[in-house]
A protein has these predicted regions:
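N-terminal hydrophobic/helix-forming segments and targeting peptides
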Residues: 1-198
Length: 198
């Protein structure tokens, strides 16, 4: 068995608490740098499966002490404003502790062939698994390829472990997204450059 694995989950957040004034406290799911979170729009999933747009807020700089301005914000000091003024209003909209939250981002195709969006790690891997399976359909192979769309990769590779323990593959090939480092590394240290593959 050759397992072709890609994960379907993405980094995000989860409702931790709804304050009396309706602001939502949250925790991270997957790897986040807290300096990248404030001022982003997010989508809060409600109990009926619809989404409410919110924006991540933090203490304004003119209210911060000098030490607060010189350090990354703690996740506990960030909140999501969904445009309500009470906990009851938030609950009436279907917001509950434990509800998932994802970044709000539009998929955009640029004129130069660049695609902008979210969760390419690892939706592109999922697309690659499908492409490989389509390409080998009907071929006589000496191995049994099995496509796997795993979950919970962003929180510890859990889905891939379950799949591997279930399928017991001889070989596993993981289709995984990786960040391009040409935006922050010097030319002699770049390993993954946008548009050049690996």
């Amino acid at each position: 068995v050759v397992m072709l694995d890609a994960h379907t989950d993405e980094v995000g957040f989860m409702v931790r608490l709804i304050r009396p004034n309706g602001l939502i406290e949250f925790t991270t799911i997957g790897g986040w740098v807290t300096t990248n979170i404030p001022a982003h729009q997010v989508l809060v999933r409600t109990i009926d499966g619809t989404y409410i747009t919110g924006i991540v807020g933090s203490k304004p700089p003119h209210y911060m002490s000098e030490s607060e301005r010189n350090q990354a914000p703690a996740i506990e000091n960030l909140y999501i404003d969904i445009g309500v003024s009470s906990q009851q209003e938030a609950c009436d909209l279907g917001v509950r502790v434990g509800n998932p939250i994802v970044p709000k981002a539009e998929l955009e195709f640029k004129n130069n062939g660049i695609i902008c969006g979210k969760a390419f790690d690892d939706r592109l891997g999922c697309a690659a698994v499908v492409e490989v399976l389509e390409a080998i359909r009907g071929e006589s192979l000496s191995v049994n390829p099995v496509g796997v769309f795993s979950s919970q990769e962003e929180v510890g590779l859990r889905g891939a472990q379950v799949a591997a323990n279930t399928l017991k593959p001889d070989v596993a090939i993981c289709f995984e997204g990786t960040p391009a480092d040409d935006t922050f590394e010097s030319c002699d240290r770049q390993q993954t450059v946008l548009g050049k593959g690996l």
